[in-house]
A protein has these predicted regions:
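C-terminal functional module detector
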Residues: 1-135
Length: 135
């Protein structure tokens, strides 16, 4: 079973309108929860300033204020694959979180795999993030 996990901003009420706004903005990820609970996954862009502003999935951000991307694992031993414009730029096994630097403008996203499940599930993504757009 695939599930869409919608991210609603903390200052917004949990209602139909904020739900629709979050989906329109791309503030969500897809989790194949039949393979395990994906609640708690996170993929954000982190700003350069002192406040380290966070840019969530679906956000558009200029390249200049962006220092890194961070992804949070929901369990140890997961394989994360980072993409830019559809091509793989980074792949690693993660126990809690990982970060990588943006490589210029483009469309960035991550996929998470559970290699511990073995074939055929280790070849299909468990979590698919929505992209962050770097302009």
């Amino acid at each position: 079973m695939a599930r869409i996990h919608v991210l609603i901003q903390k200052d917004k009420p949990l209602d139909r309108q904020s739900f629709i706004e979050a989906i329109r903005a791309g503030f969500f990820f897809v989790g194949f929860d039949a393979l395990g609970d994906t609640t708690g996954f996170s993929f954000v862009g982190v700003g350069l300033g002192l406040a380290h502003e966070k840019y969530v999935m679906g956000a558009e951000v200029a390249a200049e204020p962006l220092s890194a991307f961070q992804a949070l694992a929901v369990r140890p031993g997961l394989r994360f694959v980072a993409y830019k414009n559809g091509g793989i730029i980074f792949e690693t096994i993660v126990n809690d979180q990982f970060s990588f630097e943006p490589q210029g403008r483009g469309v960035y996203r991550v996929e998470v795999y559970r290699d511990d499940l073995g074939p055929p599930f280790d070849k299909m993504p468990w979590i698919i993030s929505n992209p962050i757009y770097v302009k």
